């Protein structure tokens, strides 16, 4: 438990609950789904990402003693080069790698991190400022364009990496570098007359500062995070002021509205999710963190409204979010196109961050349901099964033009999905006052400290392919504990047995969690069984793109149909209403997965005599089809894919 959380013990009663997530290093994946993915990311993804950073010239920007070379990424109309935030990719890679080190020491990875840290320390300015672009290219322009140039965003990701590396290894060098950088920001920004009253347009440093506070216990770090969130959206806008100081007309801002960066009004007044999707999710994650630390009901209330707006009006069935490429974000409510979906991997990952944080201050299954959806669908689709190829955009329909890439012009997503998976253990359990909240299911063993009681909790399950879960309790001495077990929102029928006896738990369910309070001893078991029928999913009528279409879901997994399995474009399929679909475990599909099989109809394109249109509908012929988990698509032969299928 972090120092700040320890200090909270014995304080005044709080307005809402505060669960403490288990440290990810205390959860080990023993078998099954997440062991396979975790091993791949640790053994393949982490080393190849460092290789790509080197091959693409990213590491060269840290050669502070050399003159800055030609730009690897040109300046865009906004005035931003992707190179402005190269530092953020080092930070996320270090963070992802660090999460693997405590349980799986790797001297080679540590040496690579230490080499980056040495260069960052060497290049840091005397006053603590740290940004490779401005130090090497434009030191006179630092802090002159918070609206466009991502200075604090990059420092935030470096800070997250520094915290993770310190927690994994105990090495303070990187942490101390970043504390000096934060000291500089504290000296530069704030409401005092001699400071700049600004904040970065790309949120990230806010949540990073909370992580730092939980390590240092320094109230200045929490105060700075609070300032950045409180100041956001204050009018007149700081961005207008700094634009005029640069000799620019604020009206020439390329995105025209500060809603792009959620700076159009104070955060507590915002009720609709707008703008750049990743920025929004990072901001809302920080708001949840500050509600947690400051016991701030106004921030929690704002988060609640924003969460309901997102999940009720703007979220893809896969957990993807942000339909538009033009602003990498949101347009209007119910605008959820499939083939042009942007649905950036980073945004889905960040929704996972936010959802998890919300569950710590309000144990509501709707937050955990969102976390589970992105984990098994809209975030996991961002990385290939071999751990070396990626999606930036996660479309829900393709005619074969979408292929995974080994790196990207703007490679923010690879390191983001990597850090999500390598830190996955923290999302499974939380503890509070003799309670253990079980959020997620998957084969693992966890070691938990529940108010001084050591608990070893082991999950045996083939989840998400099977709904049976066995929880084995390991205790050195009997103890009275409450288990709060998440009943997923997709589950309409569940059974729970405790110590060999099935129980009626319906009355104990509160907001999607079943509470079981008993005296427990070593060897006791809880068995859960979640029925997993294949379900047909339909979109709200306002989502015009999905009219007369159906999607398939089984448990938490969303399915798609891929041309590789049916030999034709799935866009020609007509799914027969109420036709049965059968789940089957296919051990040969990319490491093994449950597929869905059924009979449909196919529109015959062979009898059109070269015509594009005619007055009679196409003839239909029987067609067997197979659907695979959405997160596995584009791992095999090139071809079309579709999530929302036409229903006949």
Model-derived features: positions:
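Low-complexity, Ser/Thr/Pro/Gly-enriched N-terminal "stalk/linker" regions
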Residues: 2-89, 114-134
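Catalytic-core region of carbohydrate-active enzymes that cleave or remodel glycosidic bonds
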Residues: 289-313, 336-386
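Well-ordered alpha-helical scaffold segments within catalytic/enzyme domains
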Residues: 34, 94-107, 156-171, 205-217, ...
